Structures are given as C-alpha cells and as structure tokens.
Design a protein with these regions (language model features):
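Hydrophobic residues in well-ordered beta-strands that form the structural core
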Residues: 11, 103, 128-130, 257
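Active-site loop of classical SDR/Rossmann-like NAD(P)-dependent oxidoreductases
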Residues: 281-293, 309
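Rossmann-fold dehydrogenase core element
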Residues: 116-134, 154-160
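Contiguous beta-strand/loop segments that form the cofactor/metal-binding neighborhood of enzyme cores
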Residues: 1-3, 193-264, 282, 294-301, ...
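Beta-loop-alpha module in the N-terminal Rossmann-like domain of NAD(P)-dependent dehydrogenases
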Residues: 58-120
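C-terminal helix-rich "cap/oligomerization" subdomain common to oxidoreductases
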Residues: 1-3, 31, 77-79, 227, ...
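N-terminal Rossmann-like dinucleotide-binding module
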Residues: 1-55
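Predominantly a Rossmann-like dinucleotide-binding segment in NAD(P)-dependent oxidoreductases
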Residues: 134-206
C-alpha cells in the first residue's frame, strides 16, 4: 500500500464506545470513515449522520448488515466496537474477507475465541490488533522508554486499582451475562495489560471477588506472580469509587502513574534522594487517536501486527482473564454467527 494512501474505515457497532472514539478520527491523517453498520438501519443511519456532522466529512455508507459492510470495497479496516461476544464472528468474517481489524478491548469474551481470531489473522496474513488505546498514549510511551532505559533499575512489581462505580442495571451491556458484562472484561483488562506489558505473562494467579445479583463479576482482587519472583497486586470494582492509580516498583526507584492510569497525562519517576522527574504529555483528542494512527501506519507499511500491541500480548491477557473468571465462577461465551 502507498505510504500516503487514505485508509477507509468501517465501524461495526454504533454504541457508546463507537461514539466516544468517533471524534478522534479528526486527529488521524489520511483516515476516512467509509461505512458504518448496525443490526438496525435506523441506528446505522443516525450514526452515519453523526460521523458527517462531527468530522465535517462526506456521509459514510450505512449498513444494517455487518457482512455487507465487510464486503464494501471502500473499507480497508473494520473497527469492531460491538459487545465482547460479537467480536469473534465479526472479526473472523472480516479477516476471511482480507480486511484488517481493530478489535475493541477486551479482544474476545473467552481466551479460546481470542486465540482463534489471532490464528486466523496470522493464517490469512491480515492485520489484527486489540484496541488497547492506553499503550499508545504519549506519556505511557515515555514511561515504557524510562523503564527500558533503567530509570528505576529492574522492575520488580506493579500495584494498582481501577474502580468505577456504576448503578446496577441488568439491561445494560456492562452487567449482561449474554453480552460479556462484568468488571474483569471491562476494567480488569486495563490493569492486567499494564502489568503484563511490564512483567510478562504471570505464572500464578490468585483471584477473589464478588458478583452482581445475576452472577456477573462486580469486584476482584488479584495477586499475580511472574518469572523472577516479580509480582502484581491489582484491584478492580464496579461497586466502589477509587483513584485508578498505578505504581511500578524497581530496584532503583519507582514510577507513579497518576489517576486515571488507563488514560494518564502525567507520570512521576522517583529515585532515592532525587527530586522526582515529571513527565506531563497530553494526548491528541480523547486519546484514542494514537491507536488509530498506529493502525493506519501499520497498514501503509504492510505490517500484519503492531509492535506496540502484538497479538501475543492480547492472548496473554485473555488467558489471564480466563483464569481469573474461572476462579470467580464466571463463564463467558462468544457468538458463533454474525449478529443479525
């Protein structure tokens, strides 16, 4: 693909996260939303109008069929912004059609589906990436560079939380067993990805938690052990408020990621006897633009995976979440057919 080529995007799903990400396309050079799809043509039409109004661009095609949008020749990459169980069939259909995919986190509702999606992308040599936007934020990139350069010595552990108090509504996707609701897939994915990126895949996981009345996981505390006796202690909740802070411990110092850690703009690097070094780097837009830019750059360069968010990292997180959910007694399922 030409290094200056315009990338045509299709958006599968018109709900909360699709609307949140939409405005950040204004910060992505050479990206065009060519099509949107929902199971309802009314919702697709409304969202297509919103795209045009928000971005000041031509109105994208509106589809009431995900298969039709995937087949649209103006679409190069599909952003899968549907509930977790629907990621599998939409992503697989797109991959089999040769279309790249950016799959909203969590990558899938189960580790088995995540593995199937990754294997399909590799077999078809099609780009696939989980939408873990935190990894691409400028200040997070600076944090990783600092760790890799030895700013705090050898990292030894991670400690943090992500609490987001929500009113229980069994009709809402966030709380629905059928739609992959629950704290682990919604918030835990951030905390686990943060720890796994720094320390690798855990060798042991101990999890305890609570549930909503319908059995969906509401809270969890996790103790993870990693190679070389490194560890992480993490807490997540949909029933309590909390700061959303992360710290990285090292042999020569520590890093504080100020709340909220999954979309920070400021980190502090502490070393004994030294004034903390502050990194304060804002993101473009709401912060989603950086992952969208990464996808476009990968496609223009002919890459099938992102070096910043490789599929193996998504699979490590998926396996760890599966372990946690098993300990909490929660069983998720992925859809097998395209939503209709």
């Amino acid at each position: 693909m030409d290094t200056t080529a315009t990338i045509g995007w299709g958006i599968a799903g018109t709900g909360r996260i699709a609307r949140t990400v939409l405005d950040d396309f204004a910060h992505v050079p050479g990206a065009r939303i060519s099509a949107v799809a929902s199971r309802s043509i009314a919702r697709a039409d409304t969202f297509a109008d919103l795209v045009s109004q928000s971005l000041g661009t031509p109105r994208p095609n509106a589809h009431d069929s995900y298969a039709e949008m995937i087949a649209n020749p103006a679409v190069d990459v599909i952003y899968v912004a549907t509930p977790h169980p629907q990621h599998r069939p939409i992503a697989l259909a797109a991959i089999e059609a040769g279309k790249a995919v950016l799959v909203e986190k969590s990558f899938a509702a189960t580790a088995e589906a995540a593995t199937e999606m990754a294997e399909a992308a590799r077999a078809h040599e099609v780009f696939a990436m989980e939408g873990m936007w935190t990894r691409f934020l400028p200040v997070v990139t600076e944090m990783i560079d600092a760790v890799n350069s030895g700013a705090i010595g050898e990292p030894t552990g991670v400690q943090g939380d992500l609490f987001a108090l929500r009113d229980y509504d069994p009709e809402d996707r966030l709380f629905s067993p059928a739609l992959g609701g629950g704290v682990t897939l919604d918030l835990g994915v951030y905390a686990l990805d943060f720890a796994i990126r720094l320390l690798g895949e855990p060798t042991e996981v101990i999890a305890r938690g609570k549930h909503f009345p319908n059995g969906v996981d509401s809270d969890a505390s996790m103790l993870l052990t990693f190679p070389k006796d490194k560890f992480a202690t993490l807490a997540i909740s949909l029933t309590s408020d909390g700061p959303g802070r992360m710290t990285i411990q090292g042999t020569d110092g520590w890093i504080e990621v100020e709340p909220r850690f999954h979309h920070p703009s400021r980190i502090l690097i502490h070393r004994r006897g030294v004034i903390p070094k502050v990194h304060n780097t804002p993101a473009l837009g709401r912060g989603y633009a950086h992952e969208l830019i990464e996808v476009c750059e990968c496609l223009r360069a002919g890459r099938t995976e992102s070096q910043t968010m490789p599929l193996d990292a998504s699979l490590a997180v998926a396996r760890t979440m599966a372990n946690i959910l098993d300990q909490l007694g929660v069983e998720n399922h992925d859809d097998t057919e395209l939503p209709s």
